[in-house]
Amino acid sequence: MLRSSITQSRQLLLSPARSRTASQWLPRAGASNRISGQRFFADVKPPVVPGAPTPASPSSDTPIPPETVPKSTLADEATLPPPPPPPPAPVRKTGRFRRFLIYLILTSGFAYGGGIFLAMKSDNFHDFFTEYVPYGEDCVLYFEERDFYRRFPNTLRNANRAPKDEGNKVTIPSKSGLSWKVAEEESGADLSAKGPHMSAVEQKGDEAQIKPGTAKPEEKVAAVEKAKSDKPVKEEAPKDTTKVQEEPRKPAVPAVTPIEFATVNEGDEAVVQELVKTFNDIITVIGADESAHKFSGTIIKAKDELQKIGEKIIAIRDEARNAAQEEIKEAHATFDESARELIRRFEEARASDAAQYREEFELEREKLAHAYQEKIRTELLRAQEVAEQRLQNELVEQAIELNRKYLHEVKDLVEREREGRLSKLNELTTNVTELEKLTTDWKEVIDTNLKTQQLQVAVDAVRSVLERSTVPRPFVRELVAVKELAAEDPVVEAAIASINPTAYQRGIPSTAQIIERFRRVADEVRKASLLPEDAGIASHAASLVLSKVMFKKDAVAGSDDVESILIRTESLLEEGNIDAAAREMNTLKGWAKILSKDWLGDVRRVLEVKQALEVIETEARLQCLRVE
């Protein structure tokens, strides 16, 4: 309300000035526009007429040359009619829908961008974003592909490469190559002897390979179809022992005797085992080749050398172990001799130290005995002196006591003589003293009552400022007066310290303002009451629309929904129970509690101020009761 009134007053004050300024500057603006529309050239010299005035020199006071001043324009200005008034300004469109659409697009873009960035950094958020956000999975997949292509730029280059030209296809007949049956090796077969396996000449026949250069396309197709139609021969289990087994087919290439792996009997060393493993890997590679028989002699020699190397390593290890055992024995003997020598030296040092300590102990004992004797002698002398001094003091005290008794007796005699005349004077002095004491006590009572009344008046002033103000007003001066009047009261100081500085510096709202603001907050809370905790933009829009058509219901005592809490709070505010209303609003949860947080802060400051004033008034009454 205050802001709207200030804005209206500013508009009213500024509108006449603006109209006057616009009307004054319109003709001048038209003239300047006309002048600015013309072109002038400073480098063109006007014709010099005889008798014309000479131009001003640089030393004269004229800052602008007269040649550059357009005379005809000023003459025409008086003859021109006044410009028409400007047309009224068109009504400016608010463009709320356009702004809403732009904000929605920007917000969605920022939200999707941040979501995609977090999804690429966190696996948990990646699952949530791709599962619950529309088009989230496509966006994340697109950026992941871009990141992959950025890291591996050669991927697309290899994928787009043209396939290689393999030339003519090579077809392998169906029955060429090795067979699944193992060929029976004849006794006494020698791989080094000449035979069909040693010949490099190709056999002629139907099973020979078709050369890729001479084969026709029809033959290639027929060979491929034939290879596909052939199936592996399945071995049938013999049902009857009397049937003759099928004779196995001989393989095209004879079987090669595998080379045995190298083994070292005493190869428990890691180096030997690693060497044997490497050698066996070499044997495996050679055995997989068809020309393994060529390296059989070399492999056998290498195995013998490997066996010798293993034996040498074992021998070297045994020699090193024996040498180490001898060195260990010698070291043990040396250590034993050193230990015995060390023990002997230790015993000698301990004996010498014991003798030295014994001598030092005797010297110290004699010193201590002498010191104690001197101390006892000194204590005896001091005790004797103290006893003599105590005796002298007792004698002096007795003399003083005798003098005191003598003076008391003399005083008693004098008092008896003055009893008759001074008795009434003593009574009068006593009465005057009691009267002075009573006057002092009553003065303190009056001062206390006056201070209590002033404190009550200051508290009433603070309360009147809070109750009569229609807008929040600061009450710093009134609160300072209360603090000065109760400077030595810890209760009042604690109550003032409990008030938030913002409350007395800016003021607190009245009850009517609290109720009015509650109604505005209640509308916003009703709009957000249908929102879940993880609501999106669509949920906000749906909640805003549904809040317009919601019906208000009656408050239920045990209900904890938002509408019931708002109705109970409103009824409590109308009854004047602000504390209970704040407690009701504090039970809200989620968006409703976030929206009502500022209202609860204002109510809390109001309650703090009221509670502090009640405490100060109670303390003032308690002081009055204490005085009575």
Curated annotation (Swiss-Prot):
Intervals, Mitochondrial matrix compartment: 42-99
Its membrane topology: Single-pass membrane protein
Mitochondrial intermembrane-side positions: 121-628
Alphabetically ordered keywords of this record: Coiled coil, Membrane, Mitochondrion, Mitochondrion inner membrane, Transit peptide, Transmembrane, Transmembrane helix
Annotated Polar residues bias: 1-24
Gene Ontology biological process terms from the UniProt entry: cristae formation
Entry keyword Mitochondrion: yes
Compartments in which it is found: Mitochondrion inner membrane
Bias-annotated ranges (Basic and acidic residues): 216-250
Transmembrane segments: 100-120
InterPro entries in alphabetical order: MIC60 (IPR019133)
Region (Disordered): 1-30, 44-92, 183-252
GO CC annotation: MICOS complex
Protein's UniProt keywords contain Coiled coil: yes
Biased composition (Pro residues): 47-56, 80-90
Coiled-coil region: 301-444
Transit peptide segment: 1-41
PANTHER family on file: MICOS COMPLEX SUBUNIT MIC60 (PTHR15415:SF7), MITOFILIN (PTHR15415)
Subunit organization: Component of the mitochondrial contact site and cristae organizing system (MICOS) complex.
Purpose of the protein: Component of the MICOS complex, a large protein complex of the mitochondrial inner membrane that plays crucial roles in the maintenance of crista junctions, inner membrane architecture, and formation of contact sites to the outer membrane. Plays a role in keeping cristae membranes connected to the inner boundary membrane. Also promotes protein import via the mitochondrial intermembrane space assembly (MIA) pathway.
UniProt record similarity statement: Belongs to the MICOS complex subunit Mic60 family.
Stated name of the protein: MICOS complex subunit mic60
